[in-house]
Amino acid sequence: MIIDAHAHLWNPQAGRVNGKPVIPLTGGRSDFGGELRQMMPPYMLDGRNTVEMLMANMDYARVSGCVITQEYIDGSQDSYLLECKEKYPDRMRITCLYEEKPIADEWMSRFDGVKICGGRLENQDLLAHEEVFAQAERLGKFVAIDMADGDLQTDAMEELIGRHPDLRIAVGHFGMVTVDGWEKQIALAKHKNVYIESGGITWLFHREFYPYPSAVRAIRTAIDICGIDKLMWGSDYPRTMTAITYDMSKDFVEKTTELSDEEKRKFLGENAEKFYGFPKLAVPDKMINMVE
């Protein structure tokens, strides 16, 4: 069973970057704060990034479950994600978006976790946001956080982990693996309830491109730091699909000889099943494609 620990959905996209709006266009493009960007594959024509499209990709790639995280650049997708979870209650785990203001207990309780965009916070001191960490711990929710580059926030995170030992934390973007100091983010997973997910790793190594040998070496380094049991695969769908297919975002792991079969099973699904509390999910059938 494979689980994608880092994917995005939006309907519609209505975020901001550097104080400027992000506006969906046609052909998978967006006005990204005044710059034209290919936000997702061009066949996603109408600017919507829907759960039906994601599930079709997951089925073809034989991915059983997914975790939907959020980003300021997409705008809050809380309401849409609740709709998605109603359609796919077993296959999805969803987060509400922390926007540096209080979240009502009743609202957070409707989600599986809360997303904190650590590197995009107006106040970058994580200790100033302790209330949301404490709230998630109290309500039994996980925190998904993409931290600022390198070790800029690791000391504060260590402090928060110590204060809230029962809080489950998933650190995203594989610790911003191509930035000096990334190993300190990985080392946070030495704590019992802290895990690392690799959403965006193909973006971070995009200049090298498939089959991403440096990404595989980074996974091996992370195993040496915190152990394979704390690492989870994530695709960062759909933005990474502007360069590769959804299946390619994981099959470089499946095909490498640098990881054992047991390490692959844990990284691609078993660890996420445990961390996010997924039930035993069916594995989508293999579909023969037109070039096989």
Model-derived regions, located:
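Mid-to-C-terminal alpha-helical segments outside catalytic/metal-binding sites
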Residues: 1-5, 12-60, 65, 220-221, ...
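Hydrophobic faces of well-ordered beta-strands that scaffold small-molecule active sites
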Residues: 3-7, 66-69, 92-96, 112-116, ...
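Active-site beta-loop-alpha junctions enriched in small/polar residues
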Residues: 8, 71, 97-101, 117-119, ...
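Generic structural signal for well-ordered alpha-helices
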Residues: 51-55, 78-85, 104-105, 133, ...
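Substrate-binding cleft of extracellular glycoside hydrolase catalytic domains
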Residues: 93-109, 116-124
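Catalytic pocket-lining loop regions of alpha/beta-barrel enzymes
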Residues: 121-232, 274, 279-292
